UniProtKB/Swiss-Prot annotation:
Note: Heme 1 (or BL or b562) is low-potential and absorbs at about 562 nm, and heme 2 (or BH or b566) is high-potential and absorbs at about 566 nm.
Top-level taxon of the source organism: Eukaryota
Record function comment: Component of the ubiquinol-cytochrome c reductase complex (complex III or cytochrome b-c1 complex) that is part of the mitochondrial respiratory chain. The b-c1 complex mediates electron transfer from ubiquinol to cytochrome c. Contributes to the generation of a proton gradient across the mitochondrial membrane that is then used for ATP synthesis.
Transmembrane feature ranges: 32-52, 76-98, 113-133, 179-199, 225-245, 289-309, 321-341, 348-368
Residues that hold heme b b562 according to the record: 82, 183
Recorded topology in the membrane: Multi-pass membrane protein
PROSITE patterns named among the record's database cross-references: CYTB_CTER, CYTB_NTER
GO molecular function: metal ion binding; ubiquinol-cytochrome-c reductase activity
Name of the protein in question: Cytochrome b
Family from the record: Belongs to the cytochrome b family.
Gene of this entry: COB
Keywords of this entry: Electron transport, Heme, Iron, Membrane, Metal-binding, Mitochondrion, Mitochondrion inner membrane, Respiratory chain, Transmembrane, Transmembrane helix, Transport, Ubiquinone
Gene Ontology annotations for the cellular component aspect, listed alphabetically: mitochondrial inner membrane; respiratory chain complex III
Length: 385
C-alpha cells in the first residue's frame, strides 16, 4: 500500500485531494473553490506580515499603514496584495454563489455544504468590514460610525449596544483596537469553517452540471482536476498581478487616503464595492430597524432555497424559464451594487426599492412558482414521450 494511504495523516490528504472521485463532467465553474482557497491563503499570510508592523492605536493606525507602504521592505506589495486580495476574494465568492444558484448546489443531499457556505459568506463580509475600519482613513471612520450605528435600531437596548461596541461615545481608540483584534481572529474561524465545508462536501462528493446523482462516471482528483485547477490559478494570478502592480487603487476609495476626521463628513459614505448591493438594500427601506432587518435578511434568505426550490431536476442546465429568471436576478444584483454607490435621491430611491423587492421575490416567489411550472412541463413531456 502506498505510504500516502497508510499514513494516518496523509491518508486524509489523499482521500480529499488525490484519490477523491470527481464527476467527469464538471466544468471550469467548479474551479472557483480552489481559487477561493488561494485567496484565503493570500489574505491570511499578507495579513499576518502586515500585523507585525501595524499599530491599532487610533493616533497611529493611519500612520502605521503609511509606514508599511513607505518604510517596510515590500510593504507596499503586502498592502496592495491584501487590499486587492479582498476584492478578488469577493469576486470569486460571488461567482461561487452564483454557480451554486445556477447548478442547484443547495439541493439535498448537500444542504449542509450550502449552510456552512452561507456562514462563511457572512463571516467574510464581517472580516472585510473590520479590516476596512482598521485603515482609519476618512471613509473607514465614517463607515465604522454608520454601520455600528445600525445596532441603535434595536429597541430599548440599541444605543447601549452601540456604546459597548465603540467602547465610548463615538468611534475612538477602543473601537479600532477591538476591531483589529477581531479582524485578526475571524480569518482563522473562516479557515476552520472552510475545512468543515470541505468535509461536508466530501460526504456525497461534488455535484455536476447535469444535475444527476450517480457514482459511476467519476475520476480521481489528482492528475486531471488538479491540473485543471492550476490553469485557472495561473489565469487568476495574471489578473491579480495586473491590479496589484499596475492599478492597485482602482477598487479602493480615494477618501481613505485622508486620515479619519470625525469633524468632517464625506460627501457620500459608501462601503467597499463588494458590500454595495446590501448597502443599497439597507438604504432602500426608510425605517431604520426594518432596513437593518432587511439587509441581514438579504444574506440569510439564501438559506431558504433548499425549501423553496421544488424542482424535480437539480440545476438550471435544462430549464429555460429558470435560466431566464436567474440571469434577471444577476442583473438585478449588479443594479443594486450600482445604486449602492449613488446619492440617495430620485429616481435612485425608487429603483433601489424595486430592485430590493425583486431580490427577495426571486427566492421567495419566483423560484417556487417557476420550479412548480417546470415540474408540470417535465411531467407532460415525459407522459407524451
Amino acid at each position: 500500500m502506498a505510504f500516502r494511504k497508510s499514513n494516518v495523516y496523509l491518508s486524509l490528504v489523499n482521500s480529499y485531494l488525490i484519490d477523491s472521485p470527481q464527476p467527469s463532467t464538471i466544468n471550469y465553474w467548479w474551479n472557483l473553490g480552489s481559487l477561493l482557497g488561494l485567496c484565503l491563503v493570500i489574505q491570511i499570510l499578507t495579513g499576518i506580515f502586515m500585523a507585525m508592523h501595524y499599530s491599532s492605536n487610533i493616533e497611529l493606525a493611519f500612520s502605521s499603514v503609511e509606514h508599511i507602504m513607505r518604510d517596510v521592505q515590500y510593504g507596499w506589495l503586502l498592502r496592495y496584495m491584501h487590499a486587492n486580495g479582498a476584492s478578488f476574494f469577493f469576486i470569486c465568492m460571488y461567482m461561487h454563489i452564483a454557480k451554486g444558484l445556477y447548478y442547484g448546489s443547495y439541493r439535498s443531499p448537500r444542504v449542509t455544504v450550502w449552510i456552512v457556505g452561507v456562514i462563511i459568506f457572512v463571516l467574510t463580509m464581517a472580516a472585510a468590514f473590520l479590516g476596512y475600519c482598521c485603515v482609519y482613513g476618512q471613509m473607514s471612520h465614517w463607515g465604522a460610525t454608520v454601520i455600528t450605528n445600525l445596532f441603535s435600531a434595536i429597541p430599548f437596548v440599541g444605543q447601549d449596544i452601540v456604546q459597548w461596541l465603540w467602547g465610548g461615545f463615538s468611534v475612538s481608540n477602543p473601537t479600532i483596537q477591538r476591531f483589529f483584534a477581531l479582524h485578526y481572529l475571524v480569518p482563522f474561524i473562516i479557515a476552520a469553517l472552510v475545512v468543515m465545508h470541505f468535509m461536508a462536501l466530501h460526504v456525497h462528493g461534488s455535484s455536476n452540471p447535469l444535475g444527476i446523482t450517480g457514482n459511476m462516471d467519476r475520476i480521481g482528483m489528482h492528475g486531471y482536476f488538479i491540473f485543471k485547477d492550476l490553469i485557472t490559478v495561473f489565469v487568476f494570478l495574471i489578473f491579480f498581478s495586473l491590479f496589484v502592480f499596475f492599478s492597485p487603487n482602482t477598487l479602493g476609495h480615494p477618501d481613505n487616503y485622508i486620515p479619519g476626521n470625525p469633524l468632517v463628513t464625506p460627501a457620500s459614505i459608501v462601503p467597499e464595492w463588494y458590500l454595495l448591493p446590501f448597502y443599497a438594500i439597507l438604504r432602500s427601506i426608510p425605517d431604520k430597524l426594518l432596513g437593518v432587518i432587511t439587509m441581514f435578511a438579504a444574506i440569510l434568505v439564501l438559506l431558504v432555497l433548499p425549501i423553496t426550490d421544488r424542482s424535480v431536476v437539480r440545476g438550471n442546465t435544462f430549464k429555460v424559464l429558470s435560466k431566464f429568471f436567474f440571469f434577471l436576478f444577476i442583473f438585478n444584483f449588479l443594479l443594486l451594487g450600482q445604486i449602492g454607490q449613488l446619492h440617495i435621491e430620485p429616481p435612485f430611491v425608487l429603483m433601489g426599492q424595486i430592485a430590493t423587492f425583486l431580490y427577495f421575490a426571486y427566492f421567495i416567489i419566483i423560484v417556487p412558482i417557476i420550479s412548480t411550472i417546470e415540474n408540470v412541463l417535465f411531467y407532460i413531456g415525459r407522459v407524451n414521450n
